[in-house]
Amino acid sequence: MEKKIFTTMAAALMSAAALAQTPAFPGAEGHGRYVTGGRGGKVVHVTNLNDSGTGSFREAVKTGRRIIVFDVAGVIALKSELKIGDNITILGQTAPSPGITLRYYTVQPGNNNIIRFLRIRRGEEKDINDGADATWQRNKTGIIFDHCSFSWSIDEVASFYDNNNFTMQWCTVAESLTNPGHSKGAHGYGGIWGGKLASFHHNFVGHLTNRGPRFNGARYGWTGYTSNKDYDTYQWKNTVQAENVDFRNCVMYNAQGTCYGGPGGGQINIVNNYYKAGPSHSLKSTTLNGLKVSVSSGKERGNQDRITQVTVSTSGNSDKNHPEFYGMTSRYFINGNTTETTKGSVTKNKDWKGVIYDDGTYTYNGEEYSADKKNFYGDAVAHQTISGVSCVKIKMDAAAPTGEVTTHSAAEAFSKVLAYSGASLYRDEIDARYMEEAKTGTTSVRDKGKGLEIW
């Protein structure tokens, strides 16, 4: 049964003005649902597939307030990184078949962006650098992605954290390149996700070796939420209380055991997601064109029943300018999640039985606790002194603010995400392959360009 999830806490804090706002489009949900984009602005037509110049996509998205529509379809071969201006709406669904695909360089959204039915498949053919995500952004306000497809990155496929009022819904985040030239060697990462009211729902996350996803937490000490004027519907006392992430109804396939994070504090909901392990979780090595290729396994991959790993903030994983967050983890509300192993064993409501903890948490009466030496979580959260340290329970009894999201069971989400996620108006063969592999429990082994992909 479908139901609207809107927490008591969220309802109490939401102002009357916010409730009266108009959604970005029919079906816009989560914390970015009221983004206005280019509403009321000029309609601009993209009339060619050129990288730049009159009629190009790059020219259209330079400045707002604009609504971008497409008279053409096909691949736009970017010649440099693309930064989208503020107050822009991109309606990829207006393109004729087969839709619009952006290639070769990273795409960054701006403030107050609505981006729908767009494919961003970066690749390593034209440019290799350690920060080469397919798409990413931080320190912005008001972004909603709907039915977009992201793949083929050198760093992460899609990283969004330390943004205000963000939604990524019905998107595919898949197939980062395993070893395309990153200075750290083999990478293949999904994304770093977080935000000051951020929603990630009904997304397909697949074929990754790590960060599927990694929750960012408050470890960087970002305080940009204090200047949020457009969507200032909540008031927070500090960046830990402001960090609120809702992760629900997503499908993780062949990325099992790679969800982790939350260092530095925050509130994270993990609700009704479906975690399905793929063949690479049991594969130790394979041979391709006569080459023996190792595949990540063991602790690096995580076990097939893992929901998430709770990460403690340290000098090694957090901002060295903010040691006040060291020793802290996020707090979690975890409910309704399903795991499926490569042997077909399905476990409903795995939830807290699938959570593991970094060293540095505290145990008291059978419960795990995070340090909170400076009372960032506030007096409203019960504290317990353990070994002389003031701590808070990691498990939350009630969900953090969710925005308004139509929520399905994990099993229903699996079917719906495979049917409708990504730029599915004209689903390309790449997304179609991901969905078929998730259904059948299979993978592809391909030698693509310089990066050897093992899935």
Regions from the language model: what does each represent?
Residues 58-64, 75-91, 98-117, 122-141, ...:
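Extracellular beta-strand-rich solenoid/capping regions of secreted or surface-exposed proteins
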Residues 23-68:
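Acidic Gly/Asp/Thr-rich repetitive segments characteristic of extracellular carbohydrate-active
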